[in-house]
């Protein structure tokens, strides 16, 4: 046998061994669950083991859920006077249980929005299409603000639910 044939045979043996091992484990799990169901036990052997993820179903929310955030009032520059912007935001998620603590981050949200609006002018916010642009900017700002937290992966969208400029 040549060196290439030996390597090919060795790789084939490793793959075969891995497949047989995986099939044995899956067959054992199936057998144990089948035995538990046939014997009338209410819980299977795996439910209390480290392999419980194999038999438990993860609940998923079918539709989106919206979590409202506190109202944010900011000042913006005008030509002759200072104006105020009032925003109410909602976070869209499909995992509401994972963002239940988002209200604890409101100071971070307010700080991020304050930085975003510090460069805005009254005229910019009154232009046609400003709300769509602003919504995208607010979303990106909040995603950056939450980037160092676990919450960021559960935010599907950020919506402006109220927008008042005076």
Swiss-Prot record:
Coiled-coil region list: none
Family named by the database record: Belongs to the FliL family.
UniProt xrefs under InterPro entries: FliL
Organism taxonomic ancestry: Bacteria, Pseudomonadati, Pseudomonadota, Gammaproteobacteria, Vibrionales
Domain of life: Bacteria
A cellular component term, taken from the record's GO annotations: bacterial-type flagellum basal body
Key words, A-Z: Cell inner membrane, Cell membrane, Chemotaxis, Flagellar rotation, Membrane, Transmembrane, Transmembrane helix
Biological function: Controls the rotational direction of flagella during chemotaxis.
Pfam family, one: FliL
PANTHER family per the UniProt record, alphabetical: FLAGELLAR PROTEIN FLIL (PTHR35091:SF2)
Any one Gene Ontology BP term: bacterial-type flagellum-dependent swarming motility
Membrane-spanning residues: 6-26
UniProt protein name: Flagellar protein LafL
Topology versus the membrane: Single-pass membrane protein
């Amino acid at each position: 046998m040549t060196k290439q044939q030996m390597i090919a045979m060795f790789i084939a043996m490793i793959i075969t061994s891995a497949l047989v091992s995986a099939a044995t484990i899956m067959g054992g799990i199936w057998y144990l669950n089948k035995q538990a169901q046939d014997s009338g036990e209410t819980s299977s052997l795996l439910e209390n083991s480290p392999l419980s993820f194999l038999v438990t179903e993860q609940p998923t929310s079918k539709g989106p859920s919206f979590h409202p955030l506190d109202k944010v009032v900011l000042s913006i520059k005008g030509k002759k006077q200072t104006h105020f912007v009032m925003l109410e935001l909602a976070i869209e998620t499909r995992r509401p249980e994972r963002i239940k603590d988002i209200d604890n981050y409101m100071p971070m949200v307010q700080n991020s929005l304050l930085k975003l609006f510090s460069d805005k002018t009254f005229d910019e916010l009154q232009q046609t299409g400003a709300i769509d642009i602003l919504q995208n900017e607010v979303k990106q700002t909040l995603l950056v603000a939450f980037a160092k937290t676990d919450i960021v992966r559960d935010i599907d969208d950020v919506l402006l639910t109220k927008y008042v400029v005076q």
